């Protein structure tokens, strides 16, 4: 009879030991025995807040100001040389340009604002974490979903932090304990 045409998950590879005639296992493992992934991808708590959006907008504004530093002067000259049809609109634009120029002239103020945004962001993060640990519901969401089935499961999972998650069953603590107890 011939061999079955199936892949061997653990082919007999190794040498026989002289004492008991058993095969000595090698360090080669089949790909199916390796863990599927090594880290658990977790969702961020809360989601995007107003402070995140402000920080992103502020970052975009500073980038546009940096890119347009030389072009503001050229645009101002072009407007003054233009026709007088849109005097009110151009005066409004000039006043906003003046505000932008003040911001560019005072990099210290920009730094202070940036530091204040960072401080408020870190304060909000720590407040959200402490609120989540104490069970308070913040303005970041939650709502009825936190009390639903998957929300309760998430809380139980967070409470059982002592156990480490492993996708590799043969290397998990549970399996190792099982082998220690039942095999001798």
Curated annotation (Swiss-Prot):
Residues 85-107 have a biased composition (Acidic residues). Residues 119-133 have a biased composition (Low complexity). GO terms for biological process: mRNA cis splicing, via spliceosome; mRNA splicing, via spliceosome. It comes from the Eukaryota. Keywords: mRNA processing, mRNA splicing, Nucleus, Spliceosome. It is found in: Nucleus. InterPro entries: Cwf_Cwc_15. Disulfide bonds: none annotated. Residues 1-184 are annotated as: Disordered. One of its GO terms (molecular function) is RNA binding. GO terms for cellular component: catalytic step 2 spliceosome; nucleus; Prp19 complex; U2-type spliceosomal complex. Belongs to the CWC15 family. Associated with the spliceosome. This is Pre-mRNA-splicing factor CWC15. It comes from Eremothecium gossypii (strain ATCC 10895 / CBS 109.51 / FGSC 9923 / NRRL Y-1056) (Yeast).
